[in-house]
């Protein structure tokens, strides 16, 4: 399975003991993801949804959100 889409480059070198443990857990998690195809698809979905969410937040000025609370109120 191709897991090259998992980008972990922004995380720098470990400078504290707790970060070393976090790195071990992160490496274990990414190795688990790489050999489980279902998890890989889920993570791809999360990755794509995050990108879409970021794009929609960036374009928020172009859209006007309609408040739904007025429709839920009982008179």
Swiss-Prot record:
Alphabetical keyword list: Phosphoprotein
Amino-acid biosynthesis in keyword set: no
Transmembrane segments: none
PTM summary: Phosphorylated on serines and threonines by host kinases, including human casein kinase II.
Source organism superkingdom: Viruses
Record flagged with keyword Phosphoprotein: yes
Gene Ontology biological process terms, A to Z: viral RNA genome replication
InterPro entries: PA/PA-X
One Gene Ontology term of the molecular function aspect: RNA binding
Protein family: Belongs to the influenza viruses PA family.
Assembly and interaction partners: Influenza RNA polymerase is composed of three subunits: PB1, PB2 and PA.
Role summary: Implicated in endonuclease cleavage of capped RNA primers. Displays an elongation factor activity in viral RNA synthesis. Dispensable for viral transcription, but not replication.
Name this polypeptide is given: Polymerase acidic protein
Organism name: Influenza A virus (strain A/Camel/Mongolia/1982 H1N1)
Gene it is expressed from: PA
């Amino acid at each position: 399975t191709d897991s090259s889409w998992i980008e972990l480059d922004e995380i720098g070198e470990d400078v504290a003991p707790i970060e070393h443990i976090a790195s071990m857990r992160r490496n274990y998690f990414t190795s688990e993801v790489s050999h489980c195809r279902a998890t890989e698809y889920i993570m791809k979905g999360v990755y794509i949804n995050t990108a879409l969410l970021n794009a929609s937040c960036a374009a928020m000025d172009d859209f006007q959100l309609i408040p739904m609370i007025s429709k839920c109120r009982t008179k």
